[in-house]
UniProtKB/Swiss-Prot annotation:
Keyword Membrane: no
Protein name according to UniProt: Large ribosomal subunit protein uL6
InterPro entries: Ribosomal_uL6-like, Ribosomal_uL6-like_a/b-dom_sf, Ribosomal_uL6_a/b-dom, Ribosomal_uL6_bac-type, Ribosomal_uL6_CS
Family from the record: Belongs to the universal ribosomal protein uL6 family.
Quaternary structure (record): Part of the 50S ribosomal subunit.
Protein's job: This protein binds to the 23S rRNA, and is important in its secondary structure. It is located near the subunit interface in the base of the L7/L12 stalk, and near the tRNA binding site of the peptidyltransferase center.
Domain of life: Bacteria
Entry keyword set: Ribonucleoprotein, Ribosomal protein, RNA-binding, rRNA-binding
Gene Ontology molecular function: any one: structural constituent of ribosome
Coiled-coil ranges from the UniProt annotation: none
Cellular component GO terms, alphabetical: cytosolic large ribosomal subunit
Length: 177
């Protein structure tokens, strides 16, 4: 049984949460997010808290309630503080630069890569080998970061590639004669 769903989500000052049937909207200083909550979960908003209760007699309702609680908590954190994901480019000649809403990447291919940034994600390059993605939607930030990393994942022999800032690449030893 999920214990995550038992903890309510606290609504901080400056954040407004509204429920319309099964659609939950969270508005804050950084923006607003909307999500449809599973029908196996009852949502109750009271005393600056959002509580999630499973519907009786539905299989997996506790799990759905825990998932809904985690998603709504991420929405509340996103609209109040925002999320940031950092990427590092490791390799000779690996570069990144921003051109409008596009991210131009030079990753050792014969051609430059252009990654279009979706609405809701902003990128900045403090240096040519660093990318900082920020926004209110945690899932979208992670998805964009994974797509960029997927162009050239870090390889285990030299460690070259695009990696998350906190990622530790396990290195392998080269084959010996």
């Amino acid at each position: 049984m999920s214990r995550v769903a038992k903890a309510p989500v606290t609504i901080p000052a400056g954040v407004e949460v509204t429920l319309n049937e099964q659609t939950l909207t969270v508005k804050g200083s950084k923006g607003s997010l909307t999500r449809v909550i599973n029908s196996a979960v009852n949502v109750v908003i009271e005393d600056a808290q959002v509580k999630f209760l499973p519907v009786e007699g539905v299989d997996g309702a506790w799990a759905q309630a825990g998932t809904a609680r985690a998603l709504v908590n991420n929405m509340v954190v996103g609209v109040s503080q925002g999320f940031v994901k950092k990427l590092k480019l490791v390799g000779v000649g690996y570069r990144a630069k921003i051109a409008g809403s596009d991210l131009d990447l030079t990753l050792g291919f014969s051609h430059p890569l252009v990654h279009k940034l979706p609405a809701g994600v902003t990128a900045e390059c403090p240096s040519q080998t660093e990318i900082v993605l920020s926004g209110v939607d945690k899932q979208l930030i992670g998805q964009v970061a994974a797509e960029i990393r997927g162009y050239r994942p870090p390889e285990p022999y030299k460690g070259k590639g695009v990696r998350y800032d906190d990622e530790v690449v396990r290195r392998k030893e080269a084959k010996k004669k």
